[in-house]
Amino acid sequence: MALRVTADVWLARPWQCLHRTRALGTTATLAPKTLKPFEAIPQYSRNKWLKMIQILREQGQENLHLEMHQAFQELGPIFRHSAGGAQIVSVMLPEDAEKLHQVESILPRRMHLEPWVAHRELRGLRRGVFLLNGAEWRFNRLKLNPNVLSPKAVQNFVPMVDEVARDFLEALKKKVRQNARGSLTMDVQQSLFNYTIEASNFALFGERLGLLGHDLNPGSLKFIHALHSMFKSTTQLLFLPRSLTRWTSTQVWKEHFDAWDVISEYANRCIWKVHQELRLGSSQTYSGIVAALITQGALPLDAIKANSMKLTAGSVDTTAIPLVMTLFELARNPDVQQALRQETLAAEASIAANPQKAMSDLPLLRAALKETLRLYPVGGFLERILNSDLVLQNYHVPAGTLVLLYLYSMGRNPAVFPRPERYMPQRWLERKRSFQHLAFGFGVRQCLGRRLAEVEMLLLLHHMLKTFQVETLRQEDVQMAYRFVLMPSSSPVLTFRPIS
């Protein structure tokens, strides 16, 4: 999950580091004579004080993606604005994403997520890769990649995710059988939220939580509540200076820290159990990502815990929401749904024998997920702090500048995606689209949990399509709201009807 920050003057402390980073960069090769200066970049301005009041009333950030989309329409594909005395540049074209990637060093820098960092500092906890930059980030990331992102890692945890996906469908079939009409109409978002927690926890810690049934244990309920509370409070704290929120939002800070404490304690318990079981007798079978990391001993235990916390917290909404929106789009595009069903039925034998085949034998379904993330990018935007000077849209952008790449606006740009309002998975199979599918980021700082998320979505949808017809009466678009992640302002109601 990429770092989400606002595009305005609301965060004081994090922006201050931009002044210090400028001196760390190097100058790029001389650009053409027509190169325009940084000051010539169109400038975006707004009433920062009015926005601050709106945020304090908890109504100022939900339309961030729409406000920035409107700014691109008015100002063009690049604009800048001031935040905390520093300059931020916003872009939205694939060509600019490619340029950002081309100049990326082995130590790409991102902004820190202030509320999360504040918790780690106050509790004296180590930071995971999401909150790190520099050599420490690189050391941790190189140790984590083989156990989380590599093909071998995927091969190891795919059967665990497949087990959870099959159990989810069995639970859904049971609910349908209990309905006299032979179908089930429901808001599926919470069920998918539970599925992603269950699957991620099993892949990480090798333990099932029992979240797919009716009777959830108190510990699981407490953990789920903490995740919801953490994301909600993050949004409330993210857009305002801590010097202000310490007085105006003391209860929110308490809720935020309490939520992270629960998540931290949960990760501690899980890791302690894995550690003890390994010391008592190493299993000959794969039992999860954390067990593999502990066995290898390449990272200290507190670093494993720090990264497990992030993988646990970051693998829920970012997977559940694309599943919700994919099911909704398939429900209102039955022809697309039928094409996907034909593909999944044709691949059923190979996937049943080897669940990892879902990654290679379902190209149209993979394209459908790309199409969903084009229209509904969970992160909204990506960001980088430039290590060197760069030319974007023929403007000189100096080293140390924070550049935001808006995925929502890219995905709805007709110059990039013809007929962007249409849900057309086939477009991803017609030709190669470089730097247009960036929902998981790019380069060496792409999302660490990318493969786990892809597997969870592919297998769940594969089993869903061969079992149920998904329907909806709703044809109008679902409005999205920025709540740290981009999510439906109200979840669509879907009907699940068994396939004869």
Curated annotation (Swiss-Prot):
It holds the Pfam family p450. Its cofactor is heme. One of its GO terms (biological process) is sodium ion homeostasis. Residues 1-24 form a transit peptide. Expressed in the adrenal cortex and in different brain tissues, including hippocampus, hypothalamus, cerebellum, cerebral cortex, and midbrain. Keywords: Heme, Iron, Membrane, Metal-binding, Mitochondrion, Monooxygenase, Oxidoreductase, Steroidogenesis, Transit peptide. GO terms for cellular component: mitochondrial inner membrane; mitochondrion. It comes from the Eukaryota. It is an enzyme of class 1 (oxidoreductase). Transmembrane segments: none annotated. Heme binds at residue 447. GO terms for molecular function: corticosterone 18-monooxygenase activity; heme binding; iron ion binding; steroid 11-beta-monooxygenase activity. Its main location: mitochondrion. Its EC number is 1.14.15.4. The keyword Acetylation does not apply. It is found in: Mitochondrion membrane. It catalyses: a steroid + 2 reduced [adrenodoxin] + O2 + 2 H(+) = an 11beta-hydroxysteroid + 2 oxidized [adrenodoxin] + H2O; 21-hydroxyprogesterone + 2 reduced [adrenodoxin] + O2 + 2 H(+) = corticosterone + 2 oxidized [adrenodoxin] + H2O; 21-hydroxyprogesterone + 2 reduced [adrenodoxin] + O2 + 2 H(+) = 18-hydroxy-11-deoxycorticosterone + 2 oxidized [adrenodoxin] + H2O; 21-hydroxyprogesterone + 2 reduced [adrenodoxin] + O2 + 2 H(+) = 19-hydroxy-11-deoxycorticosterone + 2 oxidized [adrenodoxin] + H2O. Belongs to the cytochrome P450 family. PANTHER family: CYTOCHROME P450, CYTOCHROME P450 11B2, MITOCHONDRIAL. A cytochrome P450 monooxygenase involved in the biosynthesis of adrenal corticoids. Catalyzes the hydroxylation of steroids at 11beta, 18- or 19-positions, with preferred regioselectivity at 11beta and 18. Converts 11-deoxycorticosterone into corticosterone, 18-hydroxy-11-deoxycorticosterone, and/or 19-hydroxy-11-deoxycorticosterone, but not to 18-hydroxycorticosterone or aldosterone. Mechanistically, uses molecular oxygen inserting one oxygen atom into a substrate for hydroxylation and reducing the second into a water molecule. This is Cytochrome P450 11B3, mitochondrial.
